[in-house]
């Protein structure tokens, strides 16, 4: 499975500490094994899945889309304003 990253995901990932990166890497491995592990969103975000995981006591959300060939990592962040920012992503505009 080919893994693609959006520019926003890359820049957020780059700013993480090592322990946070390891948790994100583990979450990505879980998603690769079972892409439907995340919760599929509804309405205007219907093609997006969000996987929730904890780093220490902080809840992180990882938004992604997938098809049989590609897994696209869209956005990573904490819950605060996550969905608002996700809706504004140019990647999801049609």
Question: Model regions: which residues?
Answer:
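Residue-level detector of beta-strand structural context in well-folded domains
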Residues: 1, 49-51, 62
